[in-house]
C-alpha cells in the first residue's frame, strides 16, 4: 500500500471511528456531518470522498461492526475444535455473538436501532474493510456440509436474525422478560425448530 493509499485509509478509519463514537453517545439523529468532521479533524469535503451522507456512514458502520461480530464468532468456532452438527454450529455462532453484545451494550444499542434486513444482508456479502469477512461464503460452506439440503436458506437465516435481534435487545439491556442467561435455552430451542423446519432431503 502506497503512502497516498495509507493516508486515505487513515482518514476513512478516523471518520468511521469518530462517527461510531458520536452515534453511540449522541445518537444518529443528533449527530451532524459537521460534528463528525470537526471531531475527526478533517475537512467536510474529505467526508464526501468516502460517504454520501451520514446515513451512508451509519450503514457502513453497521456493516463493519456486524462483520466484526461474525468474524469473532467464526474464529471462536474454528478454534473450538469441537465436532458439532449443523444446528450446533449455527447456535454456537449465535451464542458467541450474543455474548459479545452482552459485553458491549453500546454496540448492541447502535446495531439494534439501525439494523434492517437490507443493511444486514449487504453487511454479510459486501465487506467494507479488508479485515471484514464475507459471511455469504462461510454460510454457503456450512450449508454444503449440512447432512441435508436446506430449503430457502436465506429465509432461514432471516428468521434466525429477526428472532435473535428482537428478543435479545430487551433481555440484555433490561432483563425483560428475563435475563439473557435464562432466555438462551428457550431461544436455542426456537432456533433448532427453525432449522429443522427448513431441513429438506437428506444428502446421499
Language-model-derived ranges and their functions:
Residues 14, 22-56, 60:
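Helix-turn-helix
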Residues 58-68, 72, 111, 131:
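Alpha-helical DNA-contacting segments of helix-turn-helix folds
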Residues 60, 75-103, 157-160:
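Hydrophobic alpha-helical connector segments
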Amino acid at each position: 500500500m502506497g503512502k497516498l493509499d495509507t493516508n486515505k485509509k487513515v482518514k476513512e478509519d478516523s471518520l468511521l471511528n469518530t462517527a461510531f463514537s458520536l452515534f453511540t453517545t449522541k445518537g444518529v439523529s443528533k449527530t451532524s456531518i459537521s460534528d463528525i468532521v470537526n471531531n475527526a479533524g478533517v475537512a467536510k469535503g474529505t467526508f464526501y470522498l468516502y460517504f454520501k451522507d451520514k446515513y451512508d456512514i451509519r450503514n457502513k458502520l453497521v456493516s463493519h461492526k456486524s462483520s466484526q461480530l461474525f468474524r469473532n464468532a467464526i474464529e471462536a468456532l474454528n478454534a473450538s475444535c469441537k465436532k458439532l452438527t449443523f444446528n450446533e454450529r449455527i447456535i454456537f455462532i449465535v451464542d458467541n455473538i450474543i455474548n459479545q453484545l452482552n459485553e458491549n451494550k453500546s454496540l448492541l444499542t447502535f446495531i439494534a436501532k439501525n439494523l434492517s434486513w437490507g443493511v444486514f444482508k449487504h453487511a454479510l456479502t459486501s465487506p467494507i474493510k479488508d479485515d471484514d469477512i464475507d459471511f455469504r461464503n462461510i454460510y454457503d460452506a456450512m450449508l454444503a456440509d449440512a447432512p441435508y439440503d436446506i430449503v430457502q436458506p436465506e429465509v432461514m437465516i432471516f428468521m434466525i436474525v429477526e428472532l435473535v435481534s428482537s428478543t435479545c435487545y430487551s433481555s440484555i439491556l433490561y432483563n425483560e422478560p428475563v435475563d439473557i442467561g435464562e432466555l438462551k435455552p428457550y431461544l436455542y430451542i426456537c432456533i433448532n425448530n427453525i432449522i429443522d423446519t427448513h431441513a429438506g432431503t437428506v444428502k446421499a
